[in-house]
């Protein structure tokens, strides 16, 4: 009887992480699903996944979990994160720090925790979930872009460093994904203070985002990303990074064709008219 390979998935209680955990389990992996929502974790357990309540920013807890996984981690998928939309002048630094700790520092620490075992075995895959928001920047979500640009650098640097040990690091950059968190943000009807200097901009940004998301083909489902994760995990020689979603590919391609000044005008025309 063959031993199932181990996969560790963060942010597994919803969205991309949950879909990825399910896909990997169906593909024959023993999946350790990490999250913080008790009800969602219980549901994962009922589906046969090994669910753990864990804050990825808790370094001691992360190291303890990795040490307890019999046979080591063969596949690590870093999915934990959350959106952050706010003009940069008004963004709460505590929110930005938390996003950076959750998305970048935790991803690096988890990689550090699993790499010794991967190096010893001479194999392993680390998949980082980035965003097309790491390929270009736009107003209204500057803090999110800052962190996603960081994920690009983390993944590409780490990939080159660990490749000689037989470890593959791959970055997936999805376009907008229809997750419960994103949907709730789009459906919200916030009220802005009359003296908010960014009030008009925020209303335009929210309206623009809703209209764009309603267009066919703009947003993708979490399972689309999960299927991409499974493909790169199975690939013998995956590329350093992939864009997931046609709309994301089109936007990144268009950005590459125009100058910085032209891109600047496009963004301001879309959100300030």
Tell where the protein language model's regions lie, with residue ranges.
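Residue(s) in the substrate-gating loop at a strand-loop-helix junction
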Residues: 131
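Active-site helix of classical SDR
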Residues: 111, 147-150
């Amino acid at each position: 009887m063959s031993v199932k390979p181990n996969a560790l998935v963060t942010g597994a209680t919803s969205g991309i992480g949950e879909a990825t955990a399910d896909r990997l389990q169906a593909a024959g992996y023993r999946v350790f699903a990490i999250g913080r929502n008790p009800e969602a974790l219980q549901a994962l357990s009922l589906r046969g996944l090994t669910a753990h309540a864990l804050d990825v920013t808790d370094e001691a807890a992360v190291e303890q979990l990795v040490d307890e996984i019999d046979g080591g981690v063969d596949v690590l998928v870093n999915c934990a994160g959350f959106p952050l939309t706010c003009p940069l002048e008004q963004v709460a630094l505590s929110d930005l720090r938390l996003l950076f700790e959750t998305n970048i520092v935790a991803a690096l620490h988890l990689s550090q925790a699993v790499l010794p075992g991967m190096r010893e075995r001479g194999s392993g895959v680390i998949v980082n979930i980035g965003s097309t928001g790491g390929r270009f920047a736009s107003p209204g979500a500057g803090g999110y872009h800052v962190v996603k640009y960081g994920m690009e650098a983390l993944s590409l640097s780490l990939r080159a460093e660990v490749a000689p040990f037989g470890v593959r690091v791959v970055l997936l950059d999805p376009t907008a994904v229809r997750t419960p968190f994103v949907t709730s943000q789009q459906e919200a009807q916030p009220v802005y203070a009359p003296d908010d200097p960014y009030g008009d901009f925020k209303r335009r940004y929210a309206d623009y985002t809703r209209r764009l998301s309603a267009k066919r083909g703009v947003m993708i489902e979490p399972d689309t990303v999960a299927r991409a994760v499974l493909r790169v995990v199975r690939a013998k020689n995956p590329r350093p990074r992939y864009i997931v979603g046609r709309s994301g590919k089109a936007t990144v391609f268009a950005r590459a064709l125009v100058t910085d000044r032209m891109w600047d005008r496009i963004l301001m025309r879309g959100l300030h008219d």
